[in-house]
Amino acid sequence: MCIRDRRSCVISQSGFSGEAGYEIYLRNATLYAEDMWNAVLDAGKKHQLMVIAPAHHRRIQAGILSWGQDMDQQHNPYQCNLGYQVSLSGKGEWNKKADYVGKAALEKMGKELKEGKKPYKLQLVGLELGGKPIDDYAPDFWLISNEGGGNPVGFVTSPWWHPEKKTNIAMGYVPFDGTLNANGFPKGKIGKKFKVHLPEKYSDKPGTPVDAVIVDIPFKESYNANTREVVSG
């Protein structure tokens, strides 16, 4: 907690990029947001602090999900790598004894996963893919087919060029094959191959899909590993 002209706030070492950053939460932002904004900018002048937005490629590298892009109300926590928020074992800090929206359905889903069943069709995975460097936010979902081609089986949500790896990366949904990580949470099968149908702007050959392969998320470790990364197995 900090006090700036008696403005109470909470500082969290978190962010939307995976970098070493901080977020400031005012306890009453409806009244004092402008005060805090100006105070932070004034204090940062000597450090050449400036207003920017998080780099999309770092958000994607860190595997941080964007609401409406990587998930929405149609998805459940297990299929978008948030299964750690719902206890699979019935033990530990995520064993939610209190009631919450969707509890019965999620507990049933968790039980089915432990039994080797597949209670949903698509799983969010990390992909490395070919094509020309993707340097702009995708305005639409790009379709994914099996390695041998054919009809679409999934779709890309957040693609970008990875400058360190010199390849395109993406998060996307592909058919869930029942793979679980060491902690019992669903994930994609590392090394499984697909085809991605890129727009002409990024295609090596217009009309021809590029190769893609499932890799681990995050694509790059965050400065401060979050719970999702710790339990990813």
Where are these regions (language model features)?
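Conserved, structured C-terminal
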Residues: 4-233
